[in-house]
């Protein structure tokens, strides 16, 4: 009975964050299959140690496991690379006017390419903050750095993104 209760608690507190976990894993690994494998491995690790999880936000705890699993996989493979933006992967399907959709699609591709091109330590904090909307404190817990480091990495990531997006815009401008 205790196992059933723990399984139900795990599903309620951890598995509800699978989308966020996959999103982070996808950005860190750059590949769908690697992200799926990392999330699956992270779920197994999380379940194995779930009874010892106390105090910390279940989402932050699980995302830390996902991040570490991804980093372990990247270290093992030494073949980290980034795919070009793909609508199926990122779900950017627009159904408004064709011209507006084309501009938005182009902007989304530019933004995703710029995020994918960021160094890992900047990419992970920008994804956790801007896409997953986590608090700075939670990001620090996930990444394993102090709050000030999270803030400085976010500032640098935003600055790099802004400069890269402006450079792309200038290259495209007639």
Protein language model regions, located:
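A short, charge-rich alpha-helical start-of-domain segment used by transcription regulators
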Residues: 1-23, 33-36
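C-terminal edge and immediately downstream basic/flexible tail or linker adjoining helix-turn-helix-like DNA-binding
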Residues: 1-10, 104, 137, 141-144, ...
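A short pre-motif secondary-structure segment
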Residues: 125-129
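Arg/Lys-rich amphipathic alpha helix in sigma70-family domain 2
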Residues: 64-85, 104, 166-167
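Residue-level preference for hydrophobic side chains embedded in well-ordered alpha helices
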Residues: 13, 17, 21, 42, ...
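Helix-turn-helix DNA-binding motif, specifically the short coil turn and the N-cap/start of the second
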Residues: 31, 135, 144-149
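Structural recognition of an alpha-helix C-terminal capping motif at a helix-to-coil junction
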Residues: 37-44, 48, 56-68
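Acidic, proline/glycine-rich intrinsically disordered inter-domain spacer in sigma factors
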Residues: 12, 80, 88-116
């Amino acid at each position: 009975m205790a196992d059933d209760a723990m399984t139900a608690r795990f599903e309620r507190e951890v598995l509800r964050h699978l989308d966020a976990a996959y999103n982070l894993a996808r950005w860190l690994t750059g590949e769908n299959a690697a992200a799926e494998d990392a999330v699956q491995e992270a779920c197994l690790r999380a379940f194995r140690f779930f009874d010892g999880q106390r105090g910390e936000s279940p989402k932050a705890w699980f995302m830390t496991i996902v991040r570490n699993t991804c980093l372990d996989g990247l270290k093992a493979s030494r073949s980290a690379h980034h795919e070009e933006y793909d609508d199926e992967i990122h779900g950017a399907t627009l159904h408004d006017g064709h011209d507006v959709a084309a501009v938005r699609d182009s902007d989304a591709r530019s933004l995703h390419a710029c995020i994918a091109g960021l160094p890992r330590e900047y990419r992970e904090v920008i994804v956790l903050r801007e896409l997953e909307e986590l608090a700075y404190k939670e990001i620090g817990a996930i990444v394993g750095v102090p709050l000030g480091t999270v803030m400085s990495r976010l500032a640098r990531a935003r600055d790099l993104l802004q400069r890269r997006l402006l450079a792309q815009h200038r290259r495209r401008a007639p």
